[in-house]
Every structure is written in C-alpha cells, then in structure tokens.
Amino acid sequence: MVQRWLAEPHVAEWWHDPETLEFVSSDLDHPDLAQFIVSVDGRPFAYLQCYQIGDWHVSFGPQPEGTRGLDQFIGEADMLGRGHGSAFIRAFIDRLFARGVPRMVIDPRPDNPRAIRAYEKAGFEKAGMVDTPDGPALLMVRNA
C-alpha cells in the first residue's frame, strides 16, 4: 500500500527519492521513530511518521527537549483537498501534547503551498527557512 502511494504523482512530486520506501521500511524498529497508517471510516488513506528530534535535525536549531518532528502524506488522491490532512495532523498532535510533548516541528518544501496551508490549518506557524540534507525547507512549529 505505501509503495503504491509513493508512486502516485501527487506523492512522488514531494517524496520522489527512489530509496524512500527502503528508508521508511528500514526504520520500523527505530526507537526514535513511530510510523502510522491513517484511516477514515476504516479506509487507509495516509502515512504519518513522528520522530524524536535528534542529531540529524541540527538544521532545525535549538528546540525544547522532547520536541518531535512530523512527516506525512495523503496517499489516496481522492482524499486531497477535503480537509483530512489538517484534521488528522491536529488530532495526532493534540494527543502528543496531552502526553507532555512541548513542541512539534515540520519542514515542508517552500514550494509546496498545499502542505503549508494544511499545516497552518493544523496550528503550525512559519518559523523561517532552514537548510536540510534534502534541500531548503520551511521550518514550521506548533507549541503545546
């Protein structure tokens, strides 16, 4: 399912690295990363990964201890533009904040307005541009 989603044009545009599936599947047991399939009414439609900010995210600058990062995509094209992205992101983050996570960060590409709008609807604010191993990104934050 995830492999099929990664091949969808609307996903491949942003998750185009041919090693993405290998990267995602190789991290299944990583203690700092949790991966989820998001469903609505029993229908899987999105992928979400949440990770502890660590040494590989130094480009994000100093962050409060316990800060988590988030990556996601909607795999099913017919679910785009319907508010599902911001809704499941907000619900997921609210649960983490209830468990004591102080801040969430996300780093969309600056030329991905659909993602940026969804993250703003989910409560994220623009914090500035950062350079990442994947290229320039817009750091966005949401505090508990």
What are the residue ranges of the model-derived segments?
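Conserved GNAT acetyl-CoA-binding A-motif
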Residues: 96-108
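A short, well-structured alpha-helix characteristic of acyl/acetyltransferase catalytic modules
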Residues: 1-25
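Acetyl-CoA-dependent GNAT
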Residues: 17, 25-79, 95, 99
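Conserved beta-strand segments that form the floor/walls of ligand-binding pockets within enzyme
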Residues: 69-74, 105-107, 139
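Conserved beta-strand-loop-alpha-helix junction that forms the acyl-donor binding cleft
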Residues: 106-116, 132-136, 142-144
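Active-site beta-strand termini and strand-to-loop segments that position acidic
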Residues: 39-41, 141-144
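Conserved acetyl-CoA-binding loop-helix of GNAT-fold acetyltransferases
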Residues: 75, 81-98, 117-121
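Conserved acetyl-CoA-binding loop of GNAT-fold acetyltransferases
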Residues: 120-129
